[in-house]
Amino acid sequence: LGEKTTPSAEKAIRAAAALLLLAERPALSVNGNVAALAAEEMVALAGALKIPLEVNLFHRSEERVKKIAELLREKGGAQVLGERPDASVPGLDHARALATRGGIYDADVVLIPLEDGDRCEALAAMGKKVIAIDLNPLSRTARKAAVSIVDNILRAVPALTEQVRTLSALPRSDLVKMVAEYDHEKVLHQAVQEISDHLQRQFREESHEDSGD
């Protein structure tokens, strides 16, 4: 992908921001990888939207959930859920299925950065609009989500926060139009092409250097 956000990722970020702003009950999911890489960035996004963050771990232990929840609060998280789950997502193993009413369980739009395909599919099967952040446009997560941002999480989340702030000034009808015009399949195809082009450029540059020119 290179060191910059691609045109396809920019399209997805705009659509994701519009979707989050249109949502009645949006929520942000934080797993262990997301907490390690982008806790501060996720807190900033939650703050811009004034919505909860919910801790959900693949390998859940009460101690790990508590540590991540505390980290998010230290970074300024106002609403952090996940320590006392009171519902479960159908179709997932018990620990993975745990969710919180008022958070992910009741959400109509959920952002799930760096998540696996099973969780993405299970949330989508509940009728939720799922926004993924995934470096692989061919992954099950990227394909099953409503919007997939194919970018590094450290670029994607701040860019999403910035778009939320920018688009929040627009009338609702403009946001609806943005979401309607977003073509998920087309954007994923574009992401694959961008990765291919980037790899070919790299290969040509390396071949050029190796030839001594």
Residue ranges of predicted features:
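A short, gly/pro- and small-residue-rich
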Residues: 117-138
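Acidic/glycine-enriched edge-of-secondary-structure segments
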Residues: 1-8, 29
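Gly/Ser/Thr-rich loops at beta-strand to alpha-helix junctions
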Residues: 31-40, 59-63, 115-118
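Active-site glycine-rich loop that binds ribose-phosphate moieties when present
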Residues: 86-105, 111-118
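Glycine-rich phosphate/diphosphate-binding loops that line cofactor/substrate pockets in enzymes
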Residues: 12-26, 43-48
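Long, charge-dense
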Residues: 44-96
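Short glycine-rich or small-residue beta-strand-to-loop segments that form or flank ligand, phosphate
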Residues: 24-31, 52-57
